[in-house]
Amino acid sequence: MALFQKKKYIKINPNRSIIEKQAEQPEVPDELFAKCPACKHTIYQKDLGKNKVCPNCDYNFRITAKERLAIVADKDSFVEMFTGIESKNPLDFPGYPEKLAATKARTGLDEAVITGTATIKGQKTALAIMDSTFIMASMGTVVGEKLTRLFEYATTEKLPIIVFTASGGARMQEGIMSLMQMAKTSAAVKRHSNAGLFYITVLTDPTTGGVTASFASLGDIILAEPQSLIGFAGRRVIEQTVRQTLPDDFQKAEFLLNHGFVDAIVKRTELRQKLALLLELHTEVENV
C-alpha cells in the first residue's frame, strides 16, 4: 500500500459561485449609460440631454441626422425631398448591395444624407444633414445626386441652404463615380452662389476626404462644432509624406479656426440660435 496515496475529492464546479454572484447582480441596460471619449467619465444618458453634450467636458457626441434635425429645425417643419434614389452598384463591387441593404435596415435611412426644406425659428431654408451611421456617411452617387438636386431646387426657389457635413470621404465601392460627385456638387454650389444666394456649412465630427475637398469648404459662412476632426488625408499619411511631426491639435476645428479655414466654432446648444440669426441677417427684406 502506498504511503502517500492520492486522496479522492468531490470537485465542486469552480464557476458556480461566480455564476451565482453574477445572477444576484442587477442587470444594467447598455443604453442607460455612455462613456465620454474625451474625459472618460461615465455619464447617465438622461444627463446628456437631446444635444448629446458631455456635462463634464462639453464633448459633442456624434449624433444621427434625425437627432440633429430635432435639435435644429422647428418642430414638424421639415419636408423631406429626393427620397427613393438608389445606387446601381456601377462597379459590381462584391457584397456592396448586401451592405447597403443591411445598413438601410439598421439605420432606417435610404442613404447617408437627408435632404429637404425646413424652418429655423421661422426662417425657411433648404437643409441637408449627413449621417455618419450610414457607411460613415461616405459620398457615393446617391449622396452627390441628392445634394445636387437640393442646391438646384434652392437656386430655383431662391432659398438659402444649410448643409451639416459628417463623412469619411468618397465611397470606395463606387470608385470614380464617387469621386465625380466632388465636381458635381461643387458646380451646383457655384450656380447657387452665382444667383446671389446664401450657403452655410456646419462641419461636424468627422468631416474628411472628398467631402472636405468639395462642398463642405465652399460655404459663404463655415461653422464647426467644437473639437471636430476636419481634414482631407489622414494624419499618418500626411506625416509620412512630408516627413514631419504634425501638431497634436492638427485637423481639429480650433486649429482650422486659427488658420482661417473656419469662420466660427459654435457650441451645439447655441447652434440653432446662431443659424436663425445668420438666416435673418441674409434674408432680403422687401418694401423697405
UniProtKB/Swiss-Prot annotation:
Concerning SUPFAM superfamilies, the annotation shows: ClpP/crotonase
Uppermost EC category: transferase
Which compartment or compartments is the protein found in?
A: Cytoplasm
Question: Which GO molecular function, any one, fits this protein according to its record?
Answer: acetyl-CoA carboxylase activity
Any one cellular-component term (Gene Ontology): acetyl-CoA carboxylase complex
In this protein, which residues make up the domain named CoA carboxyltransferase N-terminal?
32-288
Q: Please list the cofactors this protein needs.
A: Zn(2+)
Q: Which UniProt keywords apply?
A: ATP-binding, Cytoplasm, Fatty acid biosynthesis, Fatty acid metabolism, Lipid biosynthesis, Lipid metabolism, Metal-binding, Nucleotide-binding, Transferase, Zinc, Zinc-finger
Biological process terms in GO annotation:
fatty acid biosynthetic process; malonyl-CoA biosynthetic process
The pathway noted for it is:
Lipid metabolism; malonyl-CoA biosynthesis; malonyl-CoA from acetyl-CoA: step 1/1
Its EC number is 2.1.3.15
HAMAP family annotated for this entry? Answer: AcetylCoA_CT_beta
Q: PANTHER family from the xrefs?
A: ACETYL-COENZYME A CARBOXYLASE CARBOXYL TRANSFERASE SUBUNIT BETA, CHLOROPLASTIC
Q: Could you identify this protein by its name?
A: Acetyl-coenzyme A carboxylase carboxyl transferase subunit beta
